[in-house]
C-alpha cells in the first residue's frame, strides 16, 4: 500500500519503447500501463515467499485505481484510502505538469494561454 506510489506507473517501462523513439509498444497499445504494471507487480510478488495475499491485493488495487475514474482509464475506482490518495496525487501531478508545459511555451507578452482540455479551463498566467 505505501509502496503503491513507487509502483503505480511501473507498467510504463513496457508500455513505451526506449528513447529516442519513446513510442507505444504492442502491449502498450493493447493493454496499457495500468494492466501491464499490475501484471508485473503480481509476477514479482509471486516470487516472494510468504508475501501476504491481502497486501498483494491492496497494492494491485492501488495500481488499478490510480487514474481515479473509469473515464480516465482506471479499470477500478479507488476503494482504499491509499488508492484514493494516490489517485489525487497522480491527478495533481499531471495537471501541474500540464500547466508547467503551457507556461514554458507561452510568450513573454502572452497572458491568456487558451482552453486546456485536461485542466478544463481557459488558462492565464498569474502575476503573483
Language model feature labels by segment:
Residues 2-3:
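Short, small-residue-biased leader/transition segments that mark boundaries at the very start
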Residues 6-9, 31-70, 118-127:
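Histidine- and acidic-residue-rich, metal-dependent catalytic cores
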Residues 7, 11-12, 93:
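Short active-site segment of divalent metal-dependent hydrolases/proteases
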Residues 15-26, 46-107:
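Histidine/acidic-rich helix-loop-helix segments that form or flank divalent-metal centers
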Residues 87, 105, 109-117, 122, ...:
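N-terminal intrinsically disordered, cationic/polar leader segments
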Amino acid at each position: 500500500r505505501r509502496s503503491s506510489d513507487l509502483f503505480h506507473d511501473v507498467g510504463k517501462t513496457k508500455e513505451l519503447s526506449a528513447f529516442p523513439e519513446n513510442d507505444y509498444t504492442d502491449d502498450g497499445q493493447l493493454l496499457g500501463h495500468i494492466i501491464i504494471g499490475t501484471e508485473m507487480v503480481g509476477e514479482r510478488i509471486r516470487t516472494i515467499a510468504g508475501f501476504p495475499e491481502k497486501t498483494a491485493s491492496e497494492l494491485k488495487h492501488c495500481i488499478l485505481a490510480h487514474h481515479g475514474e473509469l473515464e480516465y482509464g482506471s479499470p477500478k475506482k479507488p476503494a482504499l484510502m491509499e488508492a484514493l490518495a494516490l489517485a489525487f496525487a497522480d491527478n495533481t501531478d499531471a495537471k501541474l505538469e500540464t500547466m508547467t508545459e503551457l507556461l514554458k511555451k507561452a510568450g513573454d507578452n502572452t497572458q491568456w494561454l487558451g482552453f486546456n482540455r485536461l485542466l478544463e479551463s481557459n488558462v492565464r498566467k498569474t502575476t503573483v
